From Swiss-Prot:
Chain's gene name: env
Organism taxonomic ancestry: Viruses, Riboviria, Pararnavirae, Artverviricota, Revtraviricetes
Region (V5): 461-471, 463-471
Pfam families to which the protein is assigned, alphabetical: GP120, GP41
Annotated protein name in UniProt: Envelope glycoprotein gp160
Site residues, Cleavage: 511-512
Residues in coiled coil: 633-667
Residue segments, region V2: 157-196
Length: 856
């Protein structure tokens, strides 16, 4: 019986506690609803192509062509350039698909076209030239201290030109290099200028020097340039050391083939870069870690001669006048440095193509003179140097020794013989030729070799060797060797993310901006989590606008400082276009914020619920373990949908606010006491009184008219007419009263004012009685509601006390049952232990008793 009672008690206790736990579980399991929140100034970017502008420290007074071009096209450089390192950011780069290379290529073409603009068409010189070899009076090259030109390298040509007198011709002579003329019908004495049959030859302006200056490429506001700082970056793939800059480093636009001159060096080891190392068609770009100096000179002290070939001013052909000596132009390179460079390059190539490979460097396999030789511009003259001595070695896989002319020569200097051409095939356009006027005096230039352009022979080489030859010709590879670590991205400052905050539709409050935001740069928080990056929104949003303003100021300063030289060329139009684009993008973002009801806000809550199908991550995962870049990639497919929902929600909210404002007069009871409203109330009161008086007058007139029509004379308005009695009630005599005493007495008044006052009094009494009845009804309702509410509160209080007592009793019962069970269990354990102890203690007695029985 006792066990049964305990079982029933535990059963009741289990039901109570089970019900309570189930309710608590249902309450706790209810997930808190999330809402979309808009953030402005988030560190998010996307790959983009935009119009870049250039910056340089060009000197307006310098006539060097690069300075002139940069003065017209570029803005001054920033004296304090900033570079912000993006911590915990990994970005993919691809130097072979970089729009910056294409833009620089177009710009350098513009530079050459503008700098070497043609002054004179040489069509009159496309005639038959009678040429002979220039005699060499020097018989030895040792005494002259240099290499002697080959016989026939320079031709002395004569030709006829028109004079100022019509019908007369004049015979002139000029010196031409062998490669600038071609024989006519294999005749050794009759020649014509090369390219006369394929293009129109024009002569560049003679007053030209040619020394490239560094040019910086800058991104407009709203865009940024990402820079990869990995020291061994091969140009493609992910980069873990990323920073953001507004402008690139200074790049010298040196046009050359085979060898890259005056570029940037690798910080550690030699770096090999190629779009596909297994494809022999692709060019291999080698970046050196140590520069090799190359000194070039044209020793012969030539003079210039001018020949008028056409009527009119400026129609002058400039050619070589006198040749000081016949020493050949050449370039000198240190043999030890070059061999050390090839050794490092061969080592890196073996890492790519196999450690057991033998690396062989050979001369160019053929083609145009610009490709076969190392071509470049030195002091205004175009040099074409034979690079066979540079690329004529074999590097074995074990000894790493060399074979070829590099070791057979005993001198410490490699001397490259060079040719000079005056008729140049322009690299920027096929079929275009230009005559570069000769430069008088000696020419010397010193450059640094910072890279190589190589090509690999194709085919199946089973002999364990790889052959590499110098290449070039596509100047995009030259620019690519400097722009490999840059990419342009578009800033996307608008971001959406879920939060617990919902937009309130009450009156707006002033927004307080936190002062704990640190200056990290516009994209400095890109690697931080979303929660940490949201602290820098103020700085980033401010810098987005300040970047636009700063660039506008830079442009205005450039125009003011160089207004006498600045011309609105194609470059000027491109710069204006870039800035207008930046302003338009900023205004577009501000327009979206305005449409969403977020104008002037960095963090803007909305009334759009967050859909778990967009992202099922928890708030802790989103804000503490996710960057804005990762988050943008995750919800990129739903961004347009979220934006449209925010717009719809804002439209609905504005509609609701409009409807609420229409009821604002009823909500603001204090406005009833405004003097303007009181004047309106008095006006309404006067209109009501006037209406009542007018109705009374109308009815009185109608009554008089009615009585006159019936033959009665009009009575006073206040004449009291007796109430007619019924047919069963006799009139009686005057003395016989009784019944008439019960008739209602009516107060009679005299005068119109008294009549008006009586009507007003009746109206006020009527209003008073009705308002009193209404007030009594309202009081009764409030009293009833208060009584019912109080009873409900007392009921809920009693219910709460009851359940509290029940919970208390259940807890006490549980504790009692637990105590009883523990006590009973303890008693059983004690009894068992006592029995065991007694049994052990009685063992000797039992043994003694057994022995006694045996003995007895």
């Amino acid at each position: 019986m006792r066990v049964k009672e305990k079982y029933q008690h535990l059963r009741r206790w289990g039901w109570r506690w089970g019900t309570m736990l189930l309710g608590m579980l249902m309450i706790c399991s209810a997930t808190e609803k999330l809402w979309v929140t808009v953030y402005y100034g988030v560190p998010v970017w996307k790959e983009a192509t935009t119009t870049l502008f250039c910056a340089s420290d060009a000197k307006a007074y310098d006539t060097e062509v690069h300075n002139v071009w940069a003065t017209h096209a570029c803005v001054p450089t920033d004296p304090n350039p900033q570079e912000v390192v993006l911590v915990n950011v990994t970005e993919n780069f691809n130097m072979w698909k970089n729009d910056m290379v294409e833009q620089m290529h177009e710009d350098i073409i513009s530079l050459w076209d503008q700098s070497l603009k043609p002054c004179v068409k040489l069509t009159p010189l496309c005639v038959s030239l009678k040429c002979t070899d220039l005699k060499n009076d020097t018989n030895t090259n040792s005494s002259s201290g240099g290499m002697i030109m080959e016989k026939g390298e320079i031709k002395n040509c004569s030709f006829n030109i028109s004079t100022s007198i019509r019908g007369k011709v004049q015979k002139e002579y000029a010196f031409f290099y062998k490669h600038d003329i071609i024989p006519i019908d294999n005749d050794t004495t009759s020649y014509t200028l090369t390219s006369c049959n394929t293009s129109v030859i024009t002569q560049a302006c003679p007053k030209v020097s040619f020394e490239p200056i560094p040019i910086h490429y800058c991104a407009p506001a709203g865009f940024a340039i990402l820079k990869c700082n990995n020291k061994t970056f091969n140009g493609t793939g992910p980069c873990t050391n990323v920073s953001t800059v507004q402008c690139t480093h200074g790049i010298k636009p040196v046009v050359s083939t085979q060898l890259l001159l005056n570029g940037s060096l690798a910080e550690e080891e030699v770096v090999i870069r190629s779009a596909n190392l297994t494809d022999n068609v692709k060019t291999i770009i080698v970046q050196l870690n140590q520069s090799v100096e190359i000194n070039c000179t044209r020793p012969n002290n030539n003079t210039r001669k001018r020949i008028r070939i056409q009527r009119g001013p400026g129609r002058t052909f400039v050619t070589i006048g006198k040749i000081g000596n016949m020493r050949q132009a050449h370039c000198n390179i240190s043999r030890a440095k070059w061999n050390n460079t090839l050794k490092q390059i061969a080592s890196k190539l073996r890492e790519q193509y196999g450690n057991n490979k033998t690396i062989i460097f050979k001369q160019s396999s053929g083609g145009d003179l610009e490709i076969v030789t190392h071509s470049f511009n030195c002091g205004g003259e175009f040099f074409y140097c034979n690079s066979t001595q540079l690329f004529n070695s074999t590097w074995f896989n074990s000894t790493w020794s060399t074979e070829g002319s590099n070791n057979t020569e005993g001198s410490d200097t490699i001397t490259l013989p060079c040719r000079i051409k005056q008729i140049i095939n322009m690299w920027q356009e096929v079929g275009k030729a230009m005559y570069a006027p000769p430069i008088s005096g000696q020419i010397r230039c010193s450059s640094n070799i910072t890279g190589l352009l190589l090509t690999r022979d194709g085919g199946n080489n089973n002999n364990g060797s790889e052959i590499f030859r110098p290449g070039g010709g596509d100047m995009r590879d030259n620019w690519r060797s400097e722009l490999y670590k840059y990419k342009v991205v578009k800033i996307e400052p608008l971001g959406v993310a879920p939060t617990k905050a919902k937009r309130r539709v009450v009156q707006r409050e002033k927004r307080a901006v936190g002062i704990g935001a640190l200056f990290l740069g516009f994209l400095g928080a890109a690697g931080s989590t979303m929660g940490a990056a949201s602290m820098t929104l103020t700085v980033q949003a401010r810098q987005l606008l300040s970047g636009i303003v700063q660039q506008q100021n830079n442009l205005l300063r450039a125009i003011e400082a160089q207004q006498h030289l600045l011309q609105l060329t194609v470059w000027g139009i491109k710069q204006l276009q870039a800035r207008i684009l930046a302003v338009e993008r900023y205004l577009k973002d501000q327009q979206l914020l305005g449409i969403w009801g977020c104008s002037g806000k960095l963090i803007c809550t909305t009334a759009v619920p967050w859909n778990a199908s967009w992202s099922n991550k928890s708030l802790e995962q989103i804000w503490n373990h996710t960057t804005w870049m990762e988050w943008d990639r995750e919800i990129n497919n739903y961004t347009s949908l979220i934006h449209s929902l925010i717009e719809e929600s804002q439209n609905q909210q504005e509609k609701n606010e409009q409807e609420l404002l229409e009821l604002d007069k009823w909500a603001s009871l204090w406005n009833w006491f405004n003097i303007t409203n009181w004047l309106w109330y008095i006006k309404i009161f006067i209109m009501i009184v006037g209406g009542l008086v007018g109705l009374r007058i109308v009815f009185a007139v109608l009554s008089i008219v009615n009585r006159v029509r019936q033959g009665h004379s009009p009575l006073s308005f206040q004449t009291h007419l007796p109430t007619p009695g019924g047919p069963d009630r006799p009139e009686g005599i005057e003395e016989e009263g009784g019944e008439r005493d019960r008739d209602r007495s009516i107060r009679l008044v005299n005068g119109s004012l008294a009549l008006i006052w009586d009507d007003l009094r009746s109206l006020c009494l009527f209003s008073y009685h009705r308002l009193r009845d209404l007030l009594l009804i309202v009081t009764r309702i409030v009293e009833l509601l208060g009584r019912r509410g109080w009873e409900a509160l007392k009921y809920w209080w009693n219910l709460l006390q009851y359940w509290s007592q029940e919970l208390k009793n259940s807890a006490v019962s549980l504790l009692n049952a637990t105590a009883i069970a523990v006590a009973e269990g303890t008693d059983r354990v004690i009894e068992v232990v006592q029995g065991a102890c007694r049994a052990i203690r009685h063992i000797p007695r039992r043994i003694r008793q057994g022995l006694e029985r045996i003995l007895l």
